[in-house]
């Protein structure tokens, strides 16, 4: 009994150790095309290249691949895969990919040619590697990575601005202005403009002629003259007083000078003539003061030029 048991164990050990060796021998016996196109490669045997459908499926699994489908073979053919051998695909028929016609390959046909043969018939196998990322495994591809570039340009925005202001060029217009403004991009540099406005005011000098004829005989005359210049500025009053004083001094000097040469007939005649002349001068000064005050009221903002004064001396006949 023990002998039978030991014999069974010996046979089992021999069988288990021989099986991997046979598998290794089968992998070494397989031949595969040098380059894979779109993951598809042609697989056969070194001694006996032909295999039935089951053997073709097992051969792909031994290589860590799967039996390719017709669509995968067609995709490889469009990428330049071409052979002159029929091979099994997953749909249990054999195909041959052709790019150029050849009488010896696929009966001078083009494309993926199909042969519906029984599964027992022997052909090579088309295996597919799903981990391939290159079109041709023999030609490494340079992968260029494009990083997204953020667009920092602000999209242009149109907005309508309605203004109730009138056009500056047509002040009489009553139609409100409606303007459409397009906002520029942030990247574009904004243009800077400078506007210089020069306002020139041309004023015509106003000549105010003031004629002063004065001969002051008493303090009452000064009061009447001051009342006549009520609407004139203080500076003009001061100038008028100065000219009055100068005129009075000149008049006194003149009278003293000519009294010695031509004595007066009577003091009463001299006094009457002086009083008559002073009254006329006061009336003329009142008229001039009223005209000057009217001009000042009409144009209060106009520039006033310094007045021109004329001094007339009083001549008294004796």
Swiss-Prot record:
GO terms for cellular component: cell periphery; plasma membrane. Residues 39-129 form the Link domain. Residues 24-234 are extracellular. The keyword Glycoprotein applies. InterPro entries: C-type_lectin-like/link_sf (IPR016186), CD44_antigen-like (IPR043210), CTDL_fold (IPR016187), Link_dom (IPR000538). Residues 284-318 are annotated as: Disordered. O-glycosylated. SMART domains: LINK. Glycans are attached at residues 52, 129. Its main location: membrane. It is a single-pass type I membrane protein. The chain crosses the membrane at residues 235-255. Keywords: Disulfide bond, Glycoprotein, Membrane, Receptor, Signal, Transmembrane, Transmembrane helix, Transport. Residues 284-305 have a biased composition (Basic and acidic residues). GO terms for molecular function: cargo receptor activity; hyaluronic acid binding; transmembrane signaling receptor activity. GO terms for biological process: cell adhesion; glycosaminoglycan catabolic process; hyaluronan catabolic process; positive regulation of cellular extravasation; receptor-mediated endocytosis. Residues 1-23 form the signal peptide. Disulfide bonds join 60-127, 84-105. Homodimer; disulfide-linked. Interacts with PDGFB and IGFBP3. Forms a transient ternary complex with PDGFB and PDGFRB in TGN. This is Lymphatic vessel endothelial hyaluronic acid receptor 1. It comes from Mus musculus.
């Amino acid at each position: 009994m023990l002998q039978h048991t030991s014999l069974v164990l010996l046979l089992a050990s021999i069988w288990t150790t021989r099986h991997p060796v046979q598998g290794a021998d089968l992998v070494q016996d397989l031949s595969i095309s040098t380059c894979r196109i779109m993951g598809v490669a042609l697989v056969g045997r070194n001694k006996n290249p032909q295999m039935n459908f089951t053997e073709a499926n097992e051969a792909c699994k031994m290589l860590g691949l799967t039996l390719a489908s017709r669509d995968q073979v067609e995709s490889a053919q469009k990428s330049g895969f071409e052979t002159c051998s029929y091979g099994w695909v997953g749909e249990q028929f054999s195909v041959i990919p052709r790019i150029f016609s050849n009488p010896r390959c696929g009966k001078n046909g083009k494309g993926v040619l199909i042969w519906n043969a029984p599964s027992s018939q022997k052909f090579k196998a088309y295996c597919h590697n799903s981990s391939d990322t290159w079109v041709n495994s023999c030609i490494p591809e340079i992968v260029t990575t494009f990083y997204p570039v953020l667009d920092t340009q602000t999209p242009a925005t149109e907005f309508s601005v309605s203004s109730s202001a009138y056009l500056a060029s047509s002040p009489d217009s009553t139609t409100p202005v409606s303007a459409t403004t397009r906002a520029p991009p942030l990247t574009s540099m904004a243009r800077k403009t400078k506007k210089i406005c020069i306002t020139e005011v041309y004023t015509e000098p106003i000549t105010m002629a003031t004629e002063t004829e004065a001969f002051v005989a008493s303090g009452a005359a000064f009061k009447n003259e001051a009342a006549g210049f009520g609407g004139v500025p203080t500076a003009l009053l001061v100038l008028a007083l100065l000219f009055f004083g100068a005129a009075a001094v000149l008049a006194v000097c003149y009278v003293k000078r000519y009294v010695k040469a031509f004595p007066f007939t009577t003091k009463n005649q001299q006094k009457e003539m002086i009083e008559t002349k002073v009254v006329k001068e006061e009336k003329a000064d009142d008229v001039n003061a009223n005209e000057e005050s009217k001009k000042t009221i009409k144009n209060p903002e106009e520039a006033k030029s310094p007045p021109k004064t004329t001094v007339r001396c009083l001549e008294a006949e004796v």
